[in-house]
Amino acid sequence: MSRTSLEVKAQRKPKFSARAYNRCPVCGRPRAYMRKFGLCRICFRNMALRGELPGVRKSSW
């Protein structure tokens, strides 16, 4: 299946609530989804490095 059809399928209400899963709205990736930001780890990193996510900065210790 193509990624767009899987995104549409994920938006439908499942028969059982345990089957529901989150997808990144930018790229459609189902894994490594961060609920707090609503993005996958790859899109999160790209947007954070570009400064598009307020309050997020690269850690240093």
From Swiss-Prot:
Family (UniProt): Belongs to the universal ribosomal protein uS14 family. Zinc-binding uS14 subfamily.
- What is the primary gene name for this protein? rpsZ
- A GO molecular function for this record? zinc ion binding
Q: What SUPFAM superfamilies would the database entry show?
A: Glucocorticoid receptor-like (DNA-binding domain)
Task: Name a biological process GO annotation.
Answer: translation
Provide an example Pfam family for this protein.
Ribosomal_S14
Q: Which PROSITE patterns match?
A: RIBOSOMAL_S14
List, alphabetically, the GO terms of the cellular component aspect. cytoplasm; small ribosomal subunit
Q: What is this protein called?
A: Small ribosomal subunit protein uS14
Spell out the NCBIfam families in the cross-references: PRK08061.1
Taxonomically, the superkingdom here is Bacteria
General function of this protein:
Binds 16S rRNA, required for the assembly of 30S particles and may also be responsible for determining the conformation of the 16S rRNA at the A site.
Keyword Kinase among UniProt keywords: no
Quaternary structure? Part of the 30S ribosomal subunit. Contacts proteins S3 and S10.
Matching Gene3D superfamilies: 30s Ribosomal Protein S14, Chain N (4.10.830.10)
Q: Which InterPro entries match?
A: Ribosomal_uS14, Ribosomal_uS14_bact, Ribosomal_uS14_CS, Ribosomal_uS14_sf
- Cofactor annotation comment: Binds 1 zinc ion per subunit.
Instruction: Name its co-factor(s).
Output: Zn(2+)
Keyword NAD among record annotations? no
Assigned keywords, A-Z: Metal-binding, Ribonucleoprotein, Ribosomal protein, RNA-binding, rRNA-binding, Zinc
Q: Which residues bind Zn(2+)?
A: 24, 27, 40, 43
